[in-house]
């Protein structure tokens, strides 16, 4: 080393020494304290500020007082003049108290997921926790970012989704849809996604979900289609769904007369007088005469749709058109001349002609003329347009709509459905119209239909435009079109949108000379309604509420104010004042802005409920009741106010003078006066010189000639009741008074021409003939008594004829409509099919069991049965339906039971549970379809295949998780480890000293050898050899399996483990090849002995270096007991009492044992210490004692030569042990382990095979059907009762039951036999063990458990419980007696009783009322009898008749009294003396005829003419009177001569 290098080395040593001196002394084993963390500051990475509440204490000062008394000297007290007194003193001092308050302070901490390390400014290290990372993020402790996110998520905690669609649209051709953690591509309609999941391919749009069409899809192009409906349907507005066309819309449903839609089907009806033909379409005339429906008194003449009654000669047809009356006097038909003055129909009455109008017309005020009714004013039918026609109206629709099938509503016409409406590309249907549009890259033509590419040359907008000749006062200015294509960076979409906006050249006309308007014809002088001229004199400045060029238009709806620029804020249909904007609310709505209310047609708290108020009516906000406009009323505002009522709710009474008023306005109550009257209430007549309605017309009569105030005619004033030039004509019908100028107010009846008193026609009464006759009266003056009409019929107040209710006919309405007819006068034929019964009044069909519908033509829907399908089925929901007639449940596949409430028994499925399941290996069978649900470990249609290798569990969906090539259990996935492996996943090798399957075998390896974990082969430690490593290496060999040869020379011995040579004295070297020289041997090797036991002599020190297991100066002593190895430093681990080898540590086992822990007995064939001796036992199966080597027979053998096996039932050494195997199992002669026979398993064969298993060790699976067991030995199926077949796959045949189906069933009357035990399940109506007994009276149904509910001694059908009604009753429970007019079984018999007599509902016998008798009560009581059955006799004097009902005597004229035994009193006459005489002059009247018997010179019919003779007061006359009388007063004789005295 050079001097320079030595100097440098010395310098480094000095520096190192200084460093070591300067370092603090740290004791050995002491820990270094952690470095403090830097304080966190705002703004540092991952530092979060948090608020926390802390208690802060502080001292709060308070003033306190202390009071006490002090002694003081006081003067003037006591005998010494001084004394000691006490005074109170108070001392104030300052105290403090501790006060705590809660304060919030900001604390800086590491954000969640981060922590701070020493010397870090902030929180820079990740801190992992279970809930730190979201969406499957992985936390890496100490990393720069706490969470490592999976693809699709980002953020420090993976809390944010990555929107892949933001970058290049995610690679999608059409649409990119972002999803949490991923994304997906979608295609536009008409395309489908390609296999790359990014590009889109065009598809046949009809092939995908039928194009969304409900019926047919018609492909137009590869991406466009059109929906089409089946015949009888039409396309809805959505272009996809179809609705059924009204069957009446097409040719009136093929009906001749009327077509009605009933439950979606066309139902033809005929007018009155016609009946439906057999084809259900045509209408045939009903021959009322032949059917007996006319009820004409004399003759009947059939006409089309009606009939006409005719009378015999000398008779005239009555007003009812049926009765005939003898002609007593000449009757003039008031309708023969000029149709009675009627413009349409005329009917002759006793009061004169009665005018009638056809439908759609009404009588005018003259009661003669028919005027058309404006049906559009009252009809709520038409939705859009209503056109009134004479006698009717017609609905119409706006352009773009068509009339609905009901003739009222309007449907939008889908113009796009037909050739796309003429659009070249796309057509969009709108309400009442349509709109064409173009695809991308095209623009719409001027015709608004065609499309042209944007690449087409544009019109040269900069070219010369055609010259336009200016109009007078007009200048034409042309605007330049903005440049179509600009250079600025505008997106392609905006460019295209701009181009499709159709830029066109515009022209603007400018008026000159202060004119304006479209033709420059207006000036400021034309401004109206307060409008002023604008400053430029080019228009009008309109005031509030007005708009338009000249302010002649009111503001448009929903605007108001100046220039109509303000929007109204009125809600719920309110209208606003065009000037002020104030809201006018409709009925039912209030508030400043009409906010307290709902829009038209809705109500409720949230205005979500619908109401249906006609005629623009609104409904109550809360209750939905209709709030009608003035003039309307009714539940739905569909009625106009009655006469002389008006206003909201028709609550106001018109104040018009009714006789002078034509009508009263229903809305505001204003009066429309009749001709000749005027005034607000029509209270005044016309002033002179005026006439007509309202008196607005001026008369044109000459001066002095009166003018008729009604007609304006000139003429003289005729007396009341007359008119004409000479006042010789009576007032025409309907007028009265002076000049017949007043109109009768008699409701169409005539009135007295002078007084105006009404002459009411038959059936009317009252001052104005507005009242009908009272109940029970008819005719003129309502003087006639109505006949006894039956069945709630009333009599016609005009004719007295009974007006039958629908369903009844006859002169007294006593007959019910004949079968097959119903309605008024029984003129409509019933349409009930399938044995349905027709109600005689309404025609409503009462359907037979199993049928329903208007005409009983529709079978019961699923879930209902019985008459009119009125009974709900009592079958388990969804598991079965019931028979429409009987109600018995018809079970769906997979269900049985009376209500189909039970699933098929195990092993059966399908309809009636008649099919056998074919599932194997214990799989569950679906009771409906028979589909197999495989248990874990099996797959296949019938679960016949085990799981493939590597899979297990249900449907073999789970993959095995075993290592080392181990297979897994197909059921639970547990690993089946191969030999040498163990653990749940077979990931562990066998522990030491074990090998084989499940490491269950013990290794037979000794002297520290290891064994192969698979087959147990020993791997010997160095120095040992042999199968069990029991043999030490022979001399000259060492190492593994003693394969190496020793190299020791000169008598040296080698270590059998390491091969090291132990040299004899005088020799040294690795192979003892060197001879020791005197100078080479140090003191330790000086002695002749040298180092012993293989010890080596250290050439430097001369000390012996002892090998393992030896100690001492010359290595002469082995290790002390309990120690071994190098320097005897290792402690032995042998069991107590066993020494260990001082070199290897191997335990020195007692004779007969071996192993590292002496835990194993000597292997067979060896014995003694270390099992080193070999047994020398003779015989075939010997065994020697492992310790002593004494010979004996091996376990399982006996005999002198050990050649005999143990007899059955014994095992072990000397065959001394008894076997414990059951069920015929045999045991191993050596170990006693049981070998079970077929069908058994267990340690002692005590267990039979579990259900479903059989064979050796129960390894085979039974193939029997569910519910069947199999023989555990042979696998033969043991069928349960009711099953048969090799695999019990068949049920018993009919009428067989029991085990093997060997027994015959004994069920009768259709009873079902239980296949298992033969018990009978009786059908409805039967009971008993063998179903041999019918249900007793009063019981029915299954097992006769139900009680009949039939009344009136009726019986019930034993199967269904249907009541069998006795005569006179009907109904489901026979609870109703026959209706009046019917009797007998089923109430089919018709009663023919007359005069309103009822009949007995059972026998049909007529129960005659008092006054009648006979079989049909057709005869009245004979004279002299009365009462019920006419059995009572009259008690009247003089043969006077009596009332046949009451027996009261009907006295003849001149007689009275209870028995007609009294003469009439003076002044009375007639029948029963009920009339009063009208005789004057003291005359009496005849008590019979009432004729007056004059006295005292009176004469005349009433004796009021003439009187007694009086003498004159003149004497001359008196004197003459004594001689002769005037000639005129002389009495004459009968012969005409003078009377003789």
UniProtKB/Swiss-Prot annotation:
InterPro entries to which the protein is assigned, alphabetical: cEGF, EGF-like_Ca-bd_dom, EGF-like_dom, EGF-type_Asp/Asn_hydroxyl_site, EGF_Ca-bd_CS, EMI_domain, Growth_fac_rcpt_cys_sf, LE_dom
PROSITE patterns cross-referenced by the UniProt entry: ASX_HYDROXYL, EGF_1, EGF_2, EGF_3, EGF_CA, EMI
A Pfam family reported for this protein in Swiss-Prot or TrEMBL: EGF_laminin
Predominant location category: secreted
The keyword Disulfide bond belongs to this UniProt entry's keyword annotation: yes
A cellular component annotation (GO) from this entry: extracellular region
Disulfide bridges in this chain: 48-111, 77-83, 110-123, 128-139, 133-147, 149-158, 165-176, 172-185, 187-200, 242-255, 248-268, 270-283, 289-300, 296-309, 311-324, 416-427, 423-436, 438-451, 520-533, 527-540, 542-551, 564-576, 570-583, 585-594, 607-619, 613-626, 628-637, 740-751, 744-758, 760-769, 786-795, 789-802, 804-813, 826-838, 832-845, 847-856, 869-882, 873-889, 891-900, 913-925, 919-932, 934-943, 999-1011, 1005-1018, 1020-1029, 1042-1054, 1048-1061, 1063-1072, 1085-1097, 1091-1104, 1106-1115, 1128-1140, 1134-1147, 1149-1158, 1215-1227, 1221-1234, 1236-1245, 1258-1270, 1264-1277, 1279-1288, 1301-1313, 1307-1320, 1322-1331, 1348-1356, 1350-1363, 1365-1374, 1387-1399, 1393-1406, 1408-1417, 1473-1485, 1479-1492, 1494-1503
Ranges annotated as biased composition (Polar residues): 1516-1535
Signal peptide region: 1-30
Record keyword Disulfide bond present: yes
Residue stretches making up the EGF-like domain: 124-159, 161-201, 206-242, 238-284, 285-325, 335-370, 375-411, 412-452, 516-552, 560-595, 603-638, 736-770, 783-814, 822-857, 865-901, 909-944, 955-987, 995-1030, 1038-1073, 1081-1116, 1124-1159, 1211-1246, 1254-1289, 1297-1332, 1345-1375, 1383-1418, 1469-1504
Glycosylation sites: 252, 739
Keywords associated with the record: Calcium, Disulfide bond, EGF-like domain, Glycoprotein, Repeat, Secreted, Signal
EMI domain segment(s): 44-125
Sequence segments annotated as region (Disordered): 1509-1541
A GO MF label: calcium ion binding
Compartments (UniProt record): Secreted
Name recorded for this polypeptide: Multiple epidermal growth factor-like domains protein 6
Native source species: Homo sapiens
Species lineage: Eukaryota, Metazoa, Chordata, Craniata, Vertebrata
């Amino acid at each position: 080393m050079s001097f320079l290098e030595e100097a440098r080395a010395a310098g480094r040593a000095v520096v190192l020494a200084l460093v070591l001196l300067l370092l603090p002394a740290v004791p050995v084993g002491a820990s270094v304290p952690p470095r403090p963390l830097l304080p966190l500051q705002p703004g540092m990475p991952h530092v979060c500020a948090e608020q926390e509440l802390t208690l802060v204490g502080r001292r709060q000062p308070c003033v306190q007082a202390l009071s006490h008394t002090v002694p003081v000297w006081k003067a003037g007290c006591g005998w010494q003049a001084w004394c000691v007194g006490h005074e109170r003193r108070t001392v104030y001092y300052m105290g403090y108290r501790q006060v705590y308050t809660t304060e919030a302070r900001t604390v800086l901490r590491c954000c969640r997921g981060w922590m701070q390390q020493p010397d870090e400014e902030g929180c820079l290290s990740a801190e992992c926790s279970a809930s730190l990372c979201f969406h499957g993020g992985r936390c890496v402790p100490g990393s720069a970012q706490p969470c490592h996110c999976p693809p699709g998520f980002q953020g420090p905690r993976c809390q944010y989704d990555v929107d892949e669609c933001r970058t290049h649209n995610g690679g999608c051709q059409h649409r990119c849809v972002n999803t949490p953690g991923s994304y997906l591509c979608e295609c536009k309609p008409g395309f489908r996604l390609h296999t790359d999941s990014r590009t889109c391919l065009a598809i046949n749009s009809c092939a995908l979900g039928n194009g969304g069409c409900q019926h047919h899809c018609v492909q137009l192009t590869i991406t466009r289609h059109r929906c089409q409906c089946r015949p009888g349907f039409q396309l809805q507005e959505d272009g996809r769904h179809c609705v059924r066309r009204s069957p009446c819309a097409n040719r009136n449903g093929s009906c001749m007369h009327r077509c009605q839609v009933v439950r979606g089907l066309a139902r033809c009806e005929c007018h009155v007088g016609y009946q439906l033909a057999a084809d259900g379409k045509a209408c045939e005339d009903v021959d009322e005469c032949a059917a007996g429906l006319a009820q004409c008194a004399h003759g009947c003449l059939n006409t089309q749709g009606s009939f006409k009654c005719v009378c015999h000669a000398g008779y005239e047809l009555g007003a009812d058109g049926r009765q005939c009356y003898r002609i007593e006097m000449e009757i003039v038909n008031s309708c023969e001349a000029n149709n009675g003055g009627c413009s349409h129909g005329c009917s002759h009455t006793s009061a004169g002609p009665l005018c009638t109008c056809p439908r759609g017309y009404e009588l005018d005020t003259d009661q003669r003329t028919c005027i058309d009714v404006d049906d559009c004013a009252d009809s709520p039918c038409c939705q859009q347009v209503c056109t009134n026609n004479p006698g009717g109206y017609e609905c119409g629709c706006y352009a773009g709509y068509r009339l609905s099938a009901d003739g009222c509503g309007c449907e939008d016409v889908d113009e796009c459905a037909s050739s796309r409406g003429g659009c070249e590309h796309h057509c969009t249907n709108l309400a009442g119209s349509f709109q064409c549009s173009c695809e991308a890259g095209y623009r719409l033509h001027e015709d608004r239909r065609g499309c042209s590419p944007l690449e087409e040359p544009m019109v040269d907008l900069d070219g010369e435009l055609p010259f336009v000749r200016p109009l007078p006062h007009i200048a034409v200015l042309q605007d330049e079109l903005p440049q179509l294509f600009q250079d600025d960076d505008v997106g392609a979409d905006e460019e295209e949108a701009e181009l499709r906006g159709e830029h066109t050249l515009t022209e603007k006309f400018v008026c000159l000379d202060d004119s304006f308007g479209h033709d420059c014809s207006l000036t400021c002088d034309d401004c109206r309604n307060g409008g002023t001229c604008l400053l430029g004199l080019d228009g009008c400045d309109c005031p509030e509420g007005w708009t338009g060029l000249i302010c002649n238009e009111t503001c448009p709806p929903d605007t108001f104010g100046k220039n109509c620029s303000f929007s109204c804020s009125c809600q719920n249909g309110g209208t606003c004042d065009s000037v002020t904007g104030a809201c006018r609310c409709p009925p039912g709505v209030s508030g400043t802005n009409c906010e307290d209310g709902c829009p038209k047609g809705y109500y409720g708290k949230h205005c979500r409920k619908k109401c249906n108020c006609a005629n623009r009516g609104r409904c109550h906000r809360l209750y939905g009741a209709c709030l009608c406009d003035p003039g309307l009323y009714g539940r739905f505002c569909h009625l106009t106010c009655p006469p002389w009522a008006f206003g909201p709710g028709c609550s106001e009474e018109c104040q018009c003078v009714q006789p002078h008023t034509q009508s009263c306005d229903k809305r505001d109550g204003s009066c429309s006066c009749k001709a000749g009257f005027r005034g607000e209430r029509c209270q005044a007549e016309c002033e002179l010189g005026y006439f007509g309605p309202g008196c607005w017309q001026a008369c044109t009569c000459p001066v002095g000639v009166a003018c008729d105030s009604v007609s304006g005619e000139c003429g003289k004033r005729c007396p009341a009741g007359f008119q004409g030039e000479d006042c010789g004509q009576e007032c025409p019908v309907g007028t009265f008074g002076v000049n017949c100028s007043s109109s009768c107010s008699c409701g169409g009846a005539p009135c007295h021409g002078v007084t105006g008193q009404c002459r009411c026609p038959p059936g009317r009464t009252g001052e104005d003939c507005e009242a009908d006759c009272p109940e029970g009266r008819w005719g003129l003056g309502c003087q006639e008594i109505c006949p006894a009409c039956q069945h709630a019929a009333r009599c016609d107040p005009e004719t007295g004829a009974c007006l039958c209710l629908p369903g009844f006919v006859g002169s007294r309405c006593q007959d019910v409509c004949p079968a097959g007819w119903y309605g008024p006068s029984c003129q409509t034929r019933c349409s009930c099919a399938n044995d349905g019964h027709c109600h005689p009044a309404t025609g409503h069909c009462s359907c037979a069991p199993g049928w329903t519908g208007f005409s009983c033509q529709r079978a019961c829907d699923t879930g209902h049965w019985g008459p009119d399908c009125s009974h709900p089925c009592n079958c388990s929901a969804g598991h079965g339906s019931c028979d429409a007639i009987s109600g018995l449940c018809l079970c769906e596949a997979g269900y049985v039971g009376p209500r189909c409430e039970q699933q098929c028994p195990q092993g059966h499925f399908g309809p009636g549970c008649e099919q056998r399941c074919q599932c194997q290996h214990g799989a569950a069978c679906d009771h409906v379809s028979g589909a197999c649900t495989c248990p874990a470990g099996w797959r296949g249609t019938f679960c016949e295949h085990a799981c493939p290798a590597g899979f297990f569990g249900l449907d073999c969906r789970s993959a095995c998780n075993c290592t080392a090539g181990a297979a897994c259990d197909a059921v639970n996935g547990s690993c089946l480890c191969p030999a040498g492996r163990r653990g749940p996943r077979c990931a562990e090798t066998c522990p030491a000293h074990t090998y084989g399957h499940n490491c269950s075998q013990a290794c037979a390896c000794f002297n520290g050898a290891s064994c192969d974990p698979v087959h147990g082969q020993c791997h010997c430690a160095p120095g040992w050899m042999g199968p069990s490593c029991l043999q030490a290496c022979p001399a000259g060999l060492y190492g593994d399996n003693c394969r190496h040869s020793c190299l020791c020379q000169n008598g040296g011995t080698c270590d059998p483990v390491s091969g090291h040579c132990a040299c004899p004295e005088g020799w040294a070297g690795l192979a003892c090849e060197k001879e020791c020289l005197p100078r080479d041997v140090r003191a330790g090797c000086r002695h002749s002995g040298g180092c012993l036991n293989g010890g080596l002599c250290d050439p430097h020190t001369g000390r012996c270096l002892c090998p393992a297991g030896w100690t001492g100066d010359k290595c002469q002593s082995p290790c002390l007991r309990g120690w071994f190895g190098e320097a005897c430093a290792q402690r032995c681990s042998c069991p107590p009492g066993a020494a260990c080898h001082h070199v290897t540590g191997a335990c020195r086992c007692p004779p007969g044992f071996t192993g590292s822990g002496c835990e194993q007995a000597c292997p067979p064939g060896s014995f003694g210490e270390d099992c080193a001796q070999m047994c020398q036992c003779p015989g075939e199966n010997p065994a020697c004692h492992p310790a002593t080597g004494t010979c004996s027979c091996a376990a399982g053998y006996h005999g002198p030569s050990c050649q005999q096996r143990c007899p059955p039932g014994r095992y072990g050494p000397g065959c001394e042990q008894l076997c414990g195997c059951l069920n015929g199992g045999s045991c191993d002669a050596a170990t006693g382990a049981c070998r079970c026979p077929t069908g058994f398993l267990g340690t002692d064969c005590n267990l039979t095979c579990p259900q479903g298993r059989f064979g050796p060790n129960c390894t085979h699976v039974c193939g029997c059907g569910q519910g069947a067991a199999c023989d555990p030995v042979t696998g033969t199926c043991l069928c349960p009762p009711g099953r048969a077949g090799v695999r019990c796959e068949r049920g018993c045949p009919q009428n067989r039951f029991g085990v093997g189906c060997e027994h015959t069933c004994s069920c009768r009357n259709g009873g079902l036999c239980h296949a298992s035990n033969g018990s009978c399940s009786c059908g409805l109506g039967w009971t008993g063990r063998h179903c041999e007994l019918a249900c007793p009276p009063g019981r029915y149904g299954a097992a006769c458990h139900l009680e009949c509910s039939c009344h009136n001694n009726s019986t019930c059908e034993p199967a269904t419980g249907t009541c069998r009604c006795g005569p006179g009753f009907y109904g489901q429970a026979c609870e109703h007696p026959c209706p009046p007019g019917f009797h007998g079984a089923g109430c089919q018999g018709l009663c023919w009783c007359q005069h309103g007599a009822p009949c007995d509902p059972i026998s049909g016998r007529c129960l005659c009322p008092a006054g009648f008798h006979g079989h049909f009560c057709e005869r009245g009581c004979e004279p002299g009898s009365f009462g019920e059955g006419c059995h009572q006799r009259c008690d009247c004097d003089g043969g006077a008749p009596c009332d046949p009902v009451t027996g009261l005597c009907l006295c003849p004229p001149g007689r009275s009294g209870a028995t007609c035994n009294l003469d009439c009193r003076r002044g009375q006459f007639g029948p029963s003396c009920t009339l009063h005489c009208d005789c004057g002059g003291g005359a009496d009247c005849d008590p019979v005829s009432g004729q007056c018997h004059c006295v005292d010179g009176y004469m005349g019919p009433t004796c009021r003419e003439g009187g007694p003779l009086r003498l004159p007061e003149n004497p001359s006359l008196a004197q003459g009177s004594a001689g002769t009388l005037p000639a005129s007063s002389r009495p004459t004789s009968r012969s005409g001569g003078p009377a003789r005295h």
